[in-house]
From Swiss-Prot:
Main location (coarse class): cytoplasm
Superkingdom as given in the UniProt entry: Bacteria
EC numbers: 1.3.1.98
Cofactor: FAD
Reactions that this protein is recorded to catalyse: UDP-N-acetyl-alpha-D-muramate + NADP(+) = UDP-N-acetyl-3-O-(1-carboxyvinyl)-alpha-D-glucosamine + NADPH + H(+)
Species this chain originates from: Brucella ovis (strain ATCC 25840 / 63/290 / NCTC 10512)
NCBIfam families cross-referenced by the UniProt entry: murB (TIGR00179), PRK13905.1 (NF010480)
Protein name per Swiss-Prot or TrEMBL: UDP-N-acetylenolpyruvoylglucosamine reductase
Taxonomic classification: Bacteria, Pseudomonadati, Pseudomonadota, Alphaproteobacteria, Hyphomicrobiales
Keyword Cell cycle: yes
Subcellular location: Cytoplasm
Family: Belongs to the MurB family.
Keyword set, alphabetical order: Cell cycle, Cell division, Cell shape, Cell wall biogenesis/degradation, Cytoplasm, FAD, Flavoprotein, NADP, Oxidoreductase, Peptidoglycan synthesis
Domain FAD-binding PCMH-type: 36-202
Gene coding for it: murB
A biological process term (GO) from this entry: peptidoglycan biosynthetic process
Length: 322
């Protein structure tokens, strides 16, 4: 069991006094994640801007755990909570999107994907319509190479600005990000703060039509009005995760308050009172049944974070304790 957030802040007494952002001990992550489940962050920090974030990183000893989250759309937090500091970039300091030249946009890491799509439409830049259908923020999109409708984040990235654990600035090229399917090999210790995107001039009517098609498709096939974290598993090579889940008889499968959506069975939903343990157990049960049915090993797309409650554990489907 982790100690209280107040105790952690007391240990750092004086180190954090000059920060302008908000420090909140023992904050429920169920208020942040779209699943509306999970234990508390020991301390939540919301920096005012990049300078404030840098000062925070320079003040916090590297042995103290630190986790960065965005708008919470792709996170499953375990019920024992998240030790150390959880950093959440605010829309006020990191959420702006601006056109910097004819074909380029700069976006803060806390900007919702939809805001980037809207800014691109206003600027007459094609190639960003897919963001209109992704329920997340740009920081997460950069980290996992988010994509939809056959387009990926890596196709639009010019460079990414980031801070390391020492608070130093780094500028990463597209190649530095090491993109692959739903993955970036950039150091997990880097905190992305903004990105420079490159688009292609296009007709606004065509861009708007593409965005409308994305939105219509999403509302037609995805449980957009449920408490969900988005796609649960990455698509295996040569097939779709939802097809394998369906073939294994897992559409609508429930564990406690967690369910694989009847509408789109690669989406886990919280039906009202699911715990983090319910959600993760359901996911591992689905992985086991798919493997038994087809020999395919599904890999989590949702990020699982934090500690189990005392006395709890979950076996991965191959019998390995996680």
């Amino acid at each position: 069991m982790m100690e209280s957030g107040e105790a952690l802040l007391k240990k750092l007494d004086g180190r954090l006094s000059g920060l302008r952002g908000r420090l909140t001990p023992d904050t429920g992550m169920d208020k942040i994640t779209w699943f509306r489940a999970g234990g508390p962050a020991q301390v939540l920090f919301q920096p005012s801007d990049e300078e404030d974030l840098s000062a925070f990183l320079k003040a916090v000893p590297e042995e103290i755990p630190l986790l960065v989250v965005g708008i919470g759309s792709n996170l499953l937090v375990r019920d024992g909570g998240v030790p150390g500091f959880v950093v959440r970039l605010s829309a006020k300091g990191f959420g702006e999107v601006e056109q910097v030249c004819d074909t380029q946009l700069r976006a803060g890491a806390a900007a919702p994907d939809k805001r980037v799509a809207a800014a691109a439409l206003e600027a007459g830049l094609a190639g960003f319509h897919f963001y209109h259908g992704i329920p997340g923020g740009i920081g997460g999109a950069l980290r996992m190479n988010a994509g939809a409708n056959g387009v990926e984040t890596r196709e639009r990235v010019v460079e990414v600005r980031a801070l390391d654990r020492k608070g130093e600035v780094h500028v990463l090229s597209n190649a530095d990000m090491g993109y692959a399917y739903r993955h970036s090999s950039a150091s997990p210790d880097l905190i992305f703060t903004s990105v420079l995107f490159e688009g292609v001039p296009g007709e606004r009517d065509d861009i708007r039509r593409a965005m409308d098609e994305v939105q219509h498709h999403r509302e037609t096939v995805q449980p957009v009005r449920e408490k969900t974290g988005g796609s649960t598993f990455k698509n295996p090579e040569g097939t779709s995760a939802w097809k394998e889940i369906d073939k294994a008889g897992c559409r609508g499968l429930r564990v406690g308050g967690a369910q694989m959506s009847e509408m789109h069975c690669n989406f886990m939903i919280n039906t009202g009172n699911a715990t983090g343990h319910d959600l993760e157990t359901l996911g591992e049960t689905v992985r086991a049944r798919v493997f038994e049915n087809s020999g395919i090993r599904l890999h989590w797309e949702i990020k699982r974070l934090g500690l189990f409650r005392e006395g709890e554990q979950i076996e991965e489907f191959l019998g390995k304790i996680v």
